[in-house]
């Protein structure tokens, strides 16, 4: 989808350096966090006793001060701080991603960065299913 991390890397390759995007906050409102490896649902039961930050090497306020278990608790009791911290984290992740894209473009190492990022980034099951349906519909269209 538009505005997702993998897509940002692709448009960065085309020289796009600035754009508006509501995805980080929209996804946060659905209790989901972006990471360098894909998305995670903070409300999922497996986070109930996960005392780690959303992403270990993230320097955002949410990751430096809150665990997934505590964020999950905040979301489950409808405390607005939970959604705010997910928005902070997701926005930070996107800014960091764009910073890395610019850095690698400037250093001439973007192709390697893009390859490594895409190889390590796993989209959600929903995205994978949408891609499969899209590929099937394109195959059907081309065979007619």
Describe these PLM feature segments.
Residues 1-54:
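Glycine-rich phosphate/ribose-binding loops and adjacent secondary-structure elements
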């Amino acid at each position: 989808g538009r505005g997702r991390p993998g897509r940002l890397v692709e448009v960065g390759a085309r020289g796009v350096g600035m754009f508006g995007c509501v995805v980080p906050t929209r996804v946060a409102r659905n209790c989901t966090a972006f990471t360098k490896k894909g998305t995670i649902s903070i409300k999922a039961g497996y986070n109930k006793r996960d005392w780690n930050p959303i992403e270990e090497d993230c320097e955002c306020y949410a990751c430096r001060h809150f665990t997934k278990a505590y964020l999950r608790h905040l979301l489950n009791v409808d405390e607005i701080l939970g959604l705010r911290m997910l928005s902070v984290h997701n926005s930070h992740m996107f800014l960091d991603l764009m910073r890395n894209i610019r850095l690698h473009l400037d250093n001439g190492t973007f192709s390697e960065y893009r390859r490594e990022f895409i190889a390590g980034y796993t989209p959600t099951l929903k995205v994978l299913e949408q891609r499969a349906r899209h590929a099937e519909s394109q195959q059907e269209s081309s065979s007619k």
